[in-house]
């Protein structure tokens, strides 16, 4: 099996990729992908996190040698933990059930950061807060917006969270699907 870096090396900067990692590869693959996009390709990225705080991710990525100054975070975790600031290189969103608010916040982050690439971590985490039908509509709208912004994206989804039929639907909105399970 190819390494994560090899699989993503040929991805065009304006492609939308659905990435379905194995649970064991999930934690290592994200820093590898960011190293490729941020450090090698010198792209500003918007990182949408549904299940981890931006502080935790920022620390992790810094320790892995990733230029976190090129990453703007949209965090749906920290505001619920009592943090209430949108200063600097992040936006906090109170509720991952508010998909309209999430879309608006992502659009603001792309504009504010001059983001050239979006990483959405993860579509399957939205399943904890929203119905599959709402997630599917959100994903369809998000991919249309990404194309209108003329940027690329990697949308992460864990394999066991959605039925194969829904994964196939999600794949239809993307340019490529990379499944490593």
Regions found by a protein language model. Name each.
Residues 50-54, 77-80, 151-162:
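Short beta-alpha junction loops
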Residues 1-60:
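Glycine-rich P-loop/Walker A and Walker A-like loops and their local beta1-loop-alpha1 context
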Residues 151, 158-181:
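Phosphate-binding/switch region of NTP-binding enzymes
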Residues 18, 117-120, 154:
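Structural motif
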Residues 61-97:
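Long, charge-dense
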Residues 33-34, 57-66, 165-172:
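Short, aromatic/basic amphipathic alpha-helical patches
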């Amino acid at each position: 099996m190819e390494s994560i870096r090899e699989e993503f090396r040929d991805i065009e900067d304006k492609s939308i990729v659905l990435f379905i990692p194995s649970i064991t590869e999930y934690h290592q693959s994200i820093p590898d992908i960011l190293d490729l996009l941020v450090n090698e390709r010198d792209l500003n990225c918007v990182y949408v996190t549904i299940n981890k705080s931006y502080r935790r991710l920022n620390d992790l990525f810094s320790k892995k040698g990733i230029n976190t100054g090129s990453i703007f975070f949209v965090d749906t975790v920290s505001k619920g933990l009592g943090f209430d600031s949108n200063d600097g290189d992040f936006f906090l969103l109170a509720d991952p059930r508010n998909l309209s608010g999430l879309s608006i916040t992502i659009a603001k982050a792309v504009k504010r950061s001059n983001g050239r690439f979006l990483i959405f971590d993860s579509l399957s985490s939205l399943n904890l807060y929203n119905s599959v039908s709402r997630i599917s509509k959100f994903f369809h709208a998000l991919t249309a917006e990404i194309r209108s912004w003329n940027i690329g994206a990697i949308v992460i989804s864990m394999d066991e969270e959605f039925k194969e039929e829904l994964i196939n639907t999600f794949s239809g909105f993307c340019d490529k699907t990379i499944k490593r399970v």
